[in-house]
Amino acid sequence: MNGSPTPKRYSSKSSRLYDDYYNIPYQYSNPTPMNRDYNDVGSRINADKLVPEEYKRNTEFINKAVQQNKELNFKLREKQNEIFELKKIAETLRSKLEKYVDITKKLEDQNLNLQIKISDLEKKLSDANSTFKEMRFPKVKDPMVDDDPVSENYDQINVPKHRAPDATGNPRTTNKVSNTSDQDSRLKAIERTLSVLTNYVMRSEDGNNDRMSPLPSPLNTISPINNRLNFQEPKRYNPTVKVNPSDDDIMMYESAELKRVEEEIEELKRKILVRKKHDLRKLSLNNQLQELQSMMDGDDNIKLDNVSKHNHATHRHSSQSSRDYSPSSDACLECSNDLYEKNRVKPENNMSETFATPTPNNR
């Protein structure tokens, strides 16, 4: 027998495990469910068995075709973008090609014109040289050569009396050499001046063309006449003058030209804007002047009408006293002016009256 004061507290059935706690069926096993087509999760078991092989193959083929279609669409977009960029580049190159073709045509025409001018100038130069030689050295008949050299008349030779002892040369030959040297130097100087003149003429005719290269001229090695003709244009950086200019040079030149043109356009726009502002200001001032003139003309007309209608002879005011001729009185301006003129007294009389002694009336 239990001697505990509370025996039921520790011997109740509620705290005791029930008998079949460890005898739960299927606790440590995995039995097959009742519906054999589905598993524990609820998905079908061996669902592919119901689908035929043809359908499987068709789905695989369709999936592959869809994937290939996506890849081909992506490649097609890339190719289209490349074609678009290439078209842009081709358009720019075509425009540049047309521009360069026009430039080459112009340069060819200029070159042809220059060649024609050069040929004409060369002809003129040759004619001028021939005429100068004819004028400078007229044709003289060749003297007859005698077989006997002793027959020459040596009495006509002017031999200097005081000759140097070592001077063994012939004075006639020395005179000829000096004359020929002087003539050659003069001819060279004339040819140089003619070349300078031709270059100056060509430069003056083609000075408006910026693309033409300046012709070489020997202006620094000639007499002061050529220094007077030393008209050199300011040099500009023009890569088209080169034989084979690079694309960078051409682009730099074009950008500089565009910048210069844009600056000129901005300057012209600014001038036009200032001119417009001045015109608008002038118009507004003219309008104000006309309005003021019209207002002045209207006021003058109103005053003339009032003067013609007003009769001062019959006009009476509330204040007819002689002292009430101030502008603040009820009298009109004309009447107040009349009163002022009537009652005005000279300053001499006023002063005499003020300092005079009063006299009684009954004297």
Curated annotation (Swiss-Prot):
Q: Which domain of life is it from?
A: Eukaryota
Which stretches are tagged as biased composition: Low complexity? 319-329
What is the purpose of this protein?
Answer: Forms a polymeric layer at the periphery of the spindle pole body (SPB) central plaque which has an essential function during SPB duplication and may facilitate attachment of the SPB to the nuclear membrane.
Per UniProt, subunit arrangement is: Component of the SPC110 complex containing at least CMD1, SPC29, SPC42 and SCP110.
Which portions of this protein are annotated as coiled-coil regions?
A: 62-136, 248-297
Carrying Phosphoserine, the residues are S213, S217, S284, S329
Where does this one sit in the cell? Nucleus; Cytoplasm, Cytoskeleton, Microtubule organizing center, Spindle pole body
Q: Which Pfam families match?
A: Spc42p
Region annotation Disordered: residue ranges?
A: 160-184, 310-363
Q: Which UniProt keywords apply?
A: Coiled coil, Cytoplasm, Cytoskeleton, Nucleus, Phosphoprotein
Q: Name one GO cellular component term.
A: spindle pole body
Q: Where in the sequence does UniProt note compositional bias of the Polar residues kind? A: 170-182, 349-363
Q: What is this protein called?
A: Spindle pole body component SPC42
Q: Which family does the similarity line name? A: Belongs to the SPC42 family.
